[in-house]
Amino acid sequence: MTKPGNKAERHIPVLLQPVLAGLMPLIGAKVIDGTFGAGGYTRALLNAGAQVIALDRDPHAVREGQSLVDEFFPRLRLMQMEFSQLDRVVEEKVDAVILDIGVSSMQFDEAERGFSFQKDGPLDMRMAQTGFTAGDVVNRLKKDDLARIFKILGEERYAGRIARMIEKRRCVQPFLRTGDLAHAIEALVGRKPGDRIHPATRVFQALRIYVNDEIGELARGLFAAESVLKPGGRLGVVSFHSLEDRMVKRFFSARSGGCRRSRYLPEIEAVPATFFSLFKGAITASKEELQQNPRSRSARLRIGIRTEAECLAKDIKLFDFAEIASFEGSKK
C-alpha cells in the first residue's frame, strides 16, 4: 500500500470522474493504462473492478508503482514500455485504453529530472532516462532547427530571437541547468508584472516534446489503441496543450469519416469508420475540480468508441504535421 506522504499519493489525476464515466462499464473490464505515471488512473480503474495492464516508459515510475502491483495482484500488471507499443502486450482485444499525454506531475516535482524551470536542475527532460537530453539539444543543434522546434512544438512567438540568443551564449558558456536557460530567456523576452505564464514555458514544452518524441509517440499510440480495442471498446485521451489535442481531434475525425478533403483533390472511396465520438468536442475540468487541482486547467478529454470495422492504414500524414530535423541530422 502507498505510504502516507508518498509522491504517488499526492498526485491527483485530472478529469478522473469523466474518464471513469466515459470508460464504463468497468467491472471485469480489461483496460490498458498507457501512461501509468503516479498510478492515479490505474488505482481508480482497479477500485472500479477492472483488470489493468499499466505501462510507463519511466523506470522510476515503474519502481514506485510496485506497491500498487502488490496491493492489487493479480489484477494489475505494470511494465516499463512506451505506450506506442501497447499492441505488443495483449493477445486478446481489450475493453478500454486510457492515455494521459505529457509529463507527469511526479516528474515535474523532481528537480533532478530537469523538466521544470521552477526548480533548478540539470537540463535533462528524458522520460525514459536514455538518449539525448534537453541540454544536448540546446547546446548542439543548429540555430534554425532550434527555432523550428520552438515554433512548431512550443508555438513560441519569439522562437527565432530565442534561438539566436542560445547560439550566441552557448559559444561562451553552454547551458547546463534549467534555471540558467529560463533566466536567459526571461532576460531576452522580458516579463510584465502580473504575467501568469513564464516566458520560458513554451520553450521548455518544445524541448520536452522533442527530447521524448511525444508527437510521434502519440501518433503511434493512437494507431496501436485502434488495433487492440474490441468492438464497443473505448479510447480515452487526456491532453494538456493544443498541439496534442489537435492531433487527437484529427485522429477521431479521420477515423469516423469526418476529415474534410480539399475540393481540388480527387474523390476517394469512402472507408468504414473505426471510431465514433462518445460526445461532441472535448470535456474540460469543472469549477470544483479547478479549485481542487489547478493543473487541470488546460486538460481536455476526448473519448472514441471502437466500431467493428477493420483497422485503417497507419498513415502519419493524416496528422498533417510539419517535419522537424532529427537530432543526429541537425547537430552543428
Swiss-Prot record:
S-adenosyl-L-methionine binds at G39, G40, Y41, D56, F83, D100, Q107. GO terms for cellular component: cytoplasm. It holds the Pfam family Methyltransf_5. GO terms for molecular function: rRNA (cytosine-N4-)-methyltransferase activity. Keywords: Cytoplasm, Methyltransferase, rRNA processing, S-adenosyl-L-methionine, Transferase. The keyword Transferase applies. It catalyses: cytidine(1402) in 16S rRNA + S-adenosyl-L-methionine = N(4)-methylcytidine(1402) in 16S rRNA + S-adenosyl-L-homocysteine + H(+). InterPro entries: RsmH, SAM-dep_MeTrfase_MraW_recog, SAM-dependent_MTases_sf. Specifically methylates the N4 position of cytidine in position 1402 (C1402) of 16S rRNA. NCBIfam families: 16S rRNA (cytosine(1402)-N(4))-methyltransferase RsmH. Belongs to the methyltransferase superfamily. RsmH family. This is Ribosomal RNA small subunit methyltransferase H.
